């Protein structure tokens, strides 16, 4: 059936309850347990925020009729994660992939602005998973360094990385995970390392997955964004200096998670600098590995939004 007007309402407000109780289809990406229960003929579709490498740390209450995953390999892992049947899991990929694959002129202009301001030629997006969360129960005590960020153990390492990027005309944009407490780099003057939060993107009229599209490479670790980024077929680097600690603390959904990380495996600053040089020089050693992992982790299509709408017979 067709969709009418679109309204924005803040959750847990009276109007939000009204629409939640009367809507036929409810799409969401985070917990929707505040509504209490579904009504007859309602469908709750959890778009979810991503499938990555990390095993489940805390039990989750299933409150959906369907949940999306990028590909069939994640059906088994999410059955265990949510404690649900395979029938509730749809390997359609995420609607936000359309935005990531298409990009936007706004994002391209924002990238040009950042590169010009820093005298840089390429932009590496760094998206670490959270270690110290705003909620203590979610903390991952796997790093013990000054800034609570991988590889950068102290101010000397931070300034070394900044100098190396400046000399090689590379800009690193660190995008904080929304659960991570803010990074504090103190009074260190950084020319080629920029730190962004969601509000910075919003102030420039951007959504995160628009901005991801304009990056020349991605640095991550165990975050699901690395799986998403495979669709762009661009270089990936994985910071793994707390891999052993994370194995003990959280564990993995794959028996050998490193096999599903098709990119530079970085354990120290020298590894990171080598990755930066490869990006500068257009060197890509992992294209075939990315293709192999992408085939296992994604159910690729041309229009992810339309795939979801078609499944539920929704026309617009």
PLM features: what roles do these ranges have?
Residues 26-27, 65-71, 90, 171-173, ...:
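A short beta-strand/loop micro-motif in the catalytic core of glycosyltransferases
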Residues 25-51, 203-250:
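A donor-sugar binding/catalytic signature common to diverse glycosyltransferases
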Residues 51-54, 62-149, 178, 285-289:
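A nucleotide-sugar donor-handling region in carbohydrate enzymes
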Residues 2-7:
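Short, small-residue-biased leader/transition segments that mark boundaries at the very start
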Residues 15-17, 57-67, 159:
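Membrane-proximal helix-turn-helix segments that form the acceptor-binding/catalytic region
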Residues 189-191, 224-297:
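Catalytic binding pocket for nucleotide-activated donors in carbohydrate/polymer assembly enzymes
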Residues 11-23, 178-227:
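Donor nucleotide-activated moiety binding/catalytic core segment of transferases
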Residues 301-316:
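C-terminal alpha-helical cap of glycosyltransferases
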